């Protein structure tokens, strides 16, 4: 097997079980020229075995699969998937009567860097974020079938937009197990008893933003009798929770017509009336907020897409978060509540909080932090990989 030899002193992060080997840590490669996605072994400059993982050209040269000396075979994949499954059993998600959508594998958080698997009812949706995981998808599918048995009827690969295209992989989304009878239409799932249509074929990510489940439940608690504005609403997750929590009215805003069509279907699916309980606005969320009447909304949800996907975009992202949150804090009704989020991994909790602080100071209003929010337990953070805590949120009480 090909060996990756590290520069002197660069083994320390691996000895602390961090799962990434950066290109700058590599001294030389022995035993041949690895192809992208190959399993390679990693050694210290002194010859000490450190782990094995998937090789890839780029800033992260190796993503560690195991710190033990073992073969990455069908049994390895079964153990890995079964470990993730058992963790979701512990969380009460597997077999739940009121929640049928959850994350089964969360990359580094489940010790499988580069792999995401979400469960929607009887379908698993797989996303590979590395060449190695993409090339391992058939073995992963077999492991999923072994773990779930007859409860799993289909596996959909949605790696076309996430796997590294420069690796020359044959990327094409599609079913790798089960019939394509579902086509491109949406399938209904439950989340805390709320019904949602999920389209994993055409939707963003794997079809739904599962990482906001706990935060949506908190919105429900604050919504009774309130006029609610949900910005960047996608398919209306927060909107449905607000309605089910007894909101007087909910307005949802997103620039995607497809997303707004799905919002309206979800509203009807849950027994509410479009135009009565809920109103959809297909337009730019920031422009909508700029022109909306101040004091109209008791509760606002501000959940934009990632403003920064690499460190070079950090400063611009922080300015954008400040502008956006200043608008929300300025416009919300006195005594109102703002739920605000960032899903940008490169924007840490401190930077996000500083951007929101600057926004509040700009408005001159009195603002208190009621909650600090993060991702749910089925999006776990590997304690040795703190970068995995990407979702951060604040709940603000604005006087």
What are these regions (language model features)?
Residues 235-248:
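Conserved SAM-binding loop of SAM-dependent methyltransferases across substrates and taxa
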Residues 225-234:
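Conserved class I S-adenosyl-L-methionine
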Residues 258-301:
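S-adenosyl-L-methionine
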Residues 1-121:
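Non-catalytic accessory regions of SAM-dependent methyltransferases
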Residues 249-254:
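Conserved SAM-binding motif I beta-strand of class I
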Residues 296, 337-399:
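C-terminal catalytic and target-recognition region of SAM-dependent MTase-like enzymes
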Residues 298-327:
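Mobile active-site "lid"/loop adjacent to the S-adenosyl-L-methionine
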Residues 105-118, 134-209:
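Non-catalytic substrate-recognition/targeting regions of SAM-dependent transferases
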């Amino acid at each position: 097997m090909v060996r990756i030899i590290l520069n002197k002193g660069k083994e320390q992060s691996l000895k602390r079980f961090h799962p990434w080997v950066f290109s700058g840590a590599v001294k030389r490669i022995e035993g041949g020229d690895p192809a992208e996605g190959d399993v390679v072994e990693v050694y210290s400059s002194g010859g000490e075995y450190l782990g094995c993982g998937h090789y890839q050209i780029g800033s992260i040269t190796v993503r560690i699969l195991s710190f033990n000396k073992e073969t990455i075979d069908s049994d390895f994949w079964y153990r890995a998937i079964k470990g993730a499954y058992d963790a979701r059993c512990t969380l009460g998600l597997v077999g739940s009567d009121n929640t049928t959508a959850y994350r089964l594998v969360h990359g580094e958080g489940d010790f499988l860097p580069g792999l995401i698997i979400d469960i929607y009812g009887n379908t698993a949706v797989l996303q590979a974020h590395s060449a190695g995981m993409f090339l391992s998808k058939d073995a992963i599918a077999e492991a999923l079938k072994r773990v779930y048995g007859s409860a799993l009827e289909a596996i959909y690969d949605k790696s076309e937009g996430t796997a590294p295209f420069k690796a020359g992989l044959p990327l094409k989304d599609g079913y790798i197990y089960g019939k394509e009878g579902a086509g491109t239409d949406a399938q209904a799932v439950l989340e805390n008893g709320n019904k949602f249509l999920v389209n994993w074929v055409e939707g963003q990510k794997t079809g739904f933003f599962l990482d906001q489940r706990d935060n949506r439940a908190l919105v429900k608690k604050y919504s009774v009798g309130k006029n609610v504005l949900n910005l960047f609403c996608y398919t209306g997750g927060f909107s449905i929770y607000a309605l089910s929590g007894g909101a007087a009215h909910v307005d949802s805003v997103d620039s995607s017509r497809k997303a707004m069509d799905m919002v309206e279907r979800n509203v009807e699916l849950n027994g509410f009336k479009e135009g009565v309980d809920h109103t959809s606005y297909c337009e730019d969320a920031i422009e909508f907020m700029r022109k909306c009447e101040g004091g109209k909304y008791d509760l606002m949800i501000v959940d934009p897409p990632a403003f920064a996907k690499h460190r070079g975009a950090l400063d611009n992202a922080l300015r954008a978060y400040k502008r956006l949150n200043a608008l929300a804090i300025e416009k919300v009704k006195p005594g109102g509540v703002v739920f605000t989020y960032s899903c940008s991994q490169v924007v840490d909790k401190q930077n996000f909080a500083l951007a929101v602080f600057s926004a509040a100071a700009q408005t001159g209003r009195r603002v208190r932090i009621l909650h600090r929010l993060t991702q749910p337990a089925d999006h776990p953070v590997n304690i040795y990989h703190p970068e995995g805590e990407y979702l951060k949120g604040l709940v603000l009480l604005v006087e």
